[in-house]
């Protein structure tokens, strides 16, 4: 098993860190999965079984286990996202994705416009390159450890505003 740990002395933010990992990927496929315990590693075999169906196999939290306020903000963002980008995904923000190597090469060098919405942006950019998607229903668990820091209810209005601005920049100015 070839695993590469990418570290930095400086805090670079989630989106830049994700891009660094994607740039470093060298295998034929790259699997990205959040490590907060909400995504079941057993699902990896389902991603692998479906790997030939599209360039990106995107997890969809079929039974999303999150606070109501997060689901509401997510639904509103999804509505705007669909209007702007029409990406054929049920859950474009979910960090559980299997992608081909060509996706890594195609989408590893952009300046993130949505620092707290990396996968929203990544999937919108993938669609603009004509890449294909497959939705894979995933059983979503409650978070095992800790609380979200960035998506806390007190920070969500600012995060949502910044992500909306990012969507507008990507759609009209990028």
Task: Please annotate each region the language model reported.
Residues 1-6:
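Acidic donor-binding segment of Leloir-type glycosyltransferases
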Residues 8-24, 29, 41-116, 143-164:
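Acceptor/aglycone-binding surface of glycosyltransferases and processive sugar-polymer synthases
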Residues 114, 123-141:
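Catalytic donor-sugar/metal-binding loop of nucleotide-sugar-dependent glycosyltransferases
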Residues 161-174:
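C-terminal, non-catalytic tails of nucleotide-sugar-dependent glycosyltransferases
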């Amino acid at each position: 098993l070839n695993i590469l740990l990418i570290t930095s002395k400086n805090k670079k933010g989630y989106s830049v860190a994700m891009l660094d990992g994607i740039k470093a990927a060298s295998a034929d496929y790259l699997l990205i999965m959040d490590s907060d315990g909400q995504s079941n590693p057993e699902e990896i075999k389902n991603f692998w079984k479906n790997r030939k169906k599209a360039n990106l196999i995107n997890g969809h939290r079929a039974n999303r286990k999150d606070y109501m306020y997060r689901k509401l903000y997510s639904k509103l963002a999804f509505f705007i996202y669909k209007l702007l980008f029409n990406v054929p995904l049920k859950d474009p923000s979910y960090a559980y994705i299997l992608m081909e190597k060509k996706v890594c090469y195609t989408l590893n060098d952009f300046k993130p416009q949505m620092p707290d919405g990396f996968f929203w942006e990544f999937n919108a950019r993938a669609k603009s390159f004509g890449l294909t998607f497959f939705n894979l229903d995933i059983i979503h668990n409650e978070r095992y450890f800790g609380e979200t820091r960035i998506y806390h209810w007190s920070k969500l209005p600012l995060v949502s505003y910044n992500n909306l601005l990012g969507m507008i920049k990507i759609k009209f100015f990028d």
